[in-house]
């Protein structure tokens, strides 16, 4: 039994990008017709993996290298629908945003700046709540405040909510 899953296709795209990124060629061709029909949206997942692998945090590099790689998809099967292309784009933008936050040095992305950046996500439809030290004291969040006492910067807790899922979907929460 074939147990090929969407994440396998994403990983395949990432592996492909890793191999071609340092090659001499800058143009590649991929046939969607060679992918067996049971792997719906194969090309979408494959290109998504390539895009995720292409991420680089080079915000502070003085010499930024730019390399254009052209991927030409031809054929009529397994192409991503416009709706799926939007889904992949949103996933990529969210992933890159998180990677940017994680990669920022602590002297740049301090608690104040972190809260400010996450507050800007309200424009994307997220409900963002920012709890400063005064609110945290009121909530009895003494352990969090205790950790923050070692810093000259204030402590913050930020919660974000996305209510765009179907009504019957189970809630999903991340804590970190």
Write out the residue ranges for each language-model feature.
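Short amphipathic alpha-helical segment within the helicase RecA-like ATPase core
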Residues: 1-175
